[in-house]
């Protein structure tokens, strides 16, 4: 999943915002809505996030001017043709059941590049990935004050090899973050600790502001 953030800015929607002597760039959907006579008060927040996502990630290939124009026209009932659009989520949320195989796949791709004499470290998640280990801890101890501590300790003993592998992944891959067992279920950790309303990312020495969006490897991941 790729965050382009190198927008062609065909609709001249990139704006600057100054806060405490710091300059931030962002993509203003209002600027484009005016060009299509679209009343944004009638557009749901979820679709506004998609509109901003398209403007910010316009690379001319995955997202181009025609695609963006079509979406804005459709929201104004001026384009009824069904089309696919691109979406680049800010981050990916995984739990251990789905996350461990994904890390193994990334490791396998690095090995494949190394075997071909290429630089293996170019293989990294292109969007932020948070892997929350929340499906593993078994209840061996209970009704004592340090039950959680003992259960987590036992979990590390049982699955030492897996945790060593995940620790290697966190140390080796860019944009990969690990939440250890005992911190909470992935949805709780996502809402309380990981999610932000607005993210800041530095591109070419310039800070960009954009809303949070997430794809989860669970059927009911919640987005702020």
Residue ranges and their predicted role:
Residues 4-224:
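Fe-S-dependent hydro-lyases/dehydratases of central metabolism
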């Amino acid at each position: 999943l790729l965050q382009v953030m190198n927008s062609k800015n065909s609709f001249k929607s990139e704006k600057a915002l100054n806060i405490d002597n710091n300059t931030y760039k962002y993509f203003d959907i209002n600027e484009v809505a005016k060009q299509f006579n679209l009343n944004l008060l009638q557009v749901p927040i979820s679709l506004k996030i998609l509109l901003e996502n398209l403007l910010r990630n316009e690379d001319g290939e995955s997202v181009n001017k025609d695609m963006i124009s079509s979406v804005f026209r459709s929201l104004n009932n001026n384009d009824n043709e069904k089309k696919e659009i691109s979406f680049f989520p800010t981050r990916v949320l995984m739990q251990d059941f789905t996350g461990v195989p994904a890390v193994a796949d990334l490791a396998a791709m690095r090995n494949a590049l190394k075997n071909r004499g290429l630089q293996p470290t170019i293989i990294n998640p292109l969007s932020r990935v948070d892997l929350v280990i929340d499906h593993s801890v078994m209840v061996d101890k209970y009704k004592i004050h340090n039950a959680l501590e003992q259960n987590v300790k036992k979990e590390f003993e049982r699955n030492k090899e897996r945790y060593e592998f995940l620790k290697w992944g966190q140390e080796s891959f860019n944009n990969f973050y690990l939440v250890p067992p005992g911190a909470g279920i992935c949805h709780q950790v996502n809402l309380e600790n990981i999610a932000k309303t607005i993210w800041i990312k530095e591109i070419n020495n310039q800070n960009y502001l954009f809303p949070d969006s997430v794809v989860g490897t669970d059927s009911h991941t919640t987005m702020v």
